[in-house]
């Protein structure tokens, strides 16, 4: 989040913070008299109005035509969120995510994280799965469903399960299906999805012609598993419109449309990623003109030596940044501890 902070007095910073937090809570423009009456600043309403004018001149507040109050601009939100990042310290237990009861599967942990994040923040939660090059084949099962129908199960190191069904022109020899299971678990299990070595093992020239043809028919199960691993877990879409204010509906509708474009969302998350600390992108920083009223808050999770993915929240620019930033930071830390344990086991 690259925000060139204007020179503000301590009082101006305080007033900006109070305006943002009040507007986030109420969705209504904030007036000088109301700000003083609610406490938090010991100056007169006229002094607050003067500071409002100064902050407006700096492009941090704006004055809606129908109200005497002020609301934050995108730049104001960015500056406020930047101040939250600067003063943020990890708070143990700040986010109620407990993965101790989750099965030792990364997929389950990612799903649990999105569900809890969306429930706690009332925002759209996005968690990206580990990249393909970190995912291996754990086990393969080749099952004869009917004399001429075979189902292949590919179970990955993240706990993902891909099923593919192949129909043959003639009955399949049960011995061939049993051989395929044994061969794949012996020669393919442990290999990285999408790797050249995996593809070579599926087309080993030393195999008999019948065996190679059979494995060729099963190949889509492995390419399908690779595609499935490019996953984005989403939570909270059903409640996305619960607190939308007038003027925000168009951006929210567009947000739901973009949810259908998982590849674009994954690219957005990768482009925003900062492995060192939580990140915030507001409005135009998302580089989607239709998302001018939307903000993204996220944090990286992973192993000590590499980043595996992101834990993110999407919502209105009028969001509780303090809560959102602390939530993704705590959730990413907990998820990192989980995957460290799981990857150590493998």
Model-based region annotation:
Residues 8, 28, 244:
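Residue-level marker of regulatory loop/turn positions in helix-turn-helix DNA-binding domains and
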Residues 19, 25, 29-84:
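N-terminal helix-turn-helix
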Residues 78-87, 91-312, 316-346:
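Intrinsically disordered, acidic Ser/Thr/Pro-rich low-complexity regulatory segments
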Residues 6-7, 42, 71, 171:
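Short, conserved sequence motifs enriched in acidic/basic residues, glycine, and aromatics
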Residues 2-4, 61-66, 318:
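A short glycine/serine-rich beta->alpha loop
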Residues 1-17:
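Short alpha-helical segments that sit at the start of domains
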């Amino acid at each position: 989040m690259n925000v060139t902070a204007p020179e503000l007095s301590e009082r101006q910073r305080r007033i900006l913070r109070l305006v943002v937090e009040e507007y986030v809570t109420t969705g209504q423009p904030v007036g000088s008299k109301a700000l003083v009456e609610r406490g938090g600043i010991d100056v007169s309403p006229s002094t607050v109005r003067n500071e409002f004018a100064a902050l407006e001149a700096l492009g941090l507040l704006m004055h809606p035509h129908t109200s005497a109050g002020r609301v934050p601009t995108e730049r104001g939100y960015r500056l406020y969120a930047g101040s939250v990042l600067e003063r943020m310290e990890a708070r143990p237990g700040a986010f109620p995510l407990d993965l101790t009861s989750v099965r030792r599967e990364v997929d389950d942990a990612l799903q649990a994280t999105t569900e809890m994040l969306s429930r706690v923040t009332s925002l759209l939660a996005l968690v990206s799965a580990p990249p393909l090059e970190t995912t291996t084949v754990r086990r393969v099962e080749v099952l004869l469903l009917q004399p001429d129908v075979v189902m292949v199960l590919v179970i990955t190191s993240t706990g993902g399960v891909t099923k593919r069904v192949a129909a043959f022109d003639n009955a399949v020899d049960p011995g061939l299906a049993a051989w395929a299971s044994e061969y794949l678990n012996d020669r393919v299990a442990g290999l990285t999805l999408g790797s050249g070595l995996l593809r070579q093992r599926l087309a080993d020239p030393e195999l008999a012609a019948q065996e190679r043809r059979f494995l060729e028919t099963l190949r889509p199960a492995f390419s399908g598993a690779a595609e499935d691993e490019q996953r984005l877990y989403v939570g909270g879409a059903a409640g996305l419109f619960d607190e939308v204010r007038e003027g925000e509906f168009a951006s929210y509708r567009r947000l739901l449309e973009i949810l259908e474009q998982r590849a674009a969302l994954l690219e957005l998350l990768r482009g925003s990623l900062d492995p060192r600390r939580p990140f915030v992108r507001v409005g135009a920083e998302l580089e989607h003109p239709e998302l001018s009223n939307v903000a993204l808050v996220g944090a990286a999770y992973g192993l000590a030596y590499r980043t595996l993915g992101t834990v993110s929240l999407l919502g209105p620019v009028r969001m509780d940044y303090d809560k959102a930033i602390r939530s993704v930071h705590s959730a990413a830390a907990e998820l990192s501890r989980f995957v460290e344990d799981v990857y150590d086991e493998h």
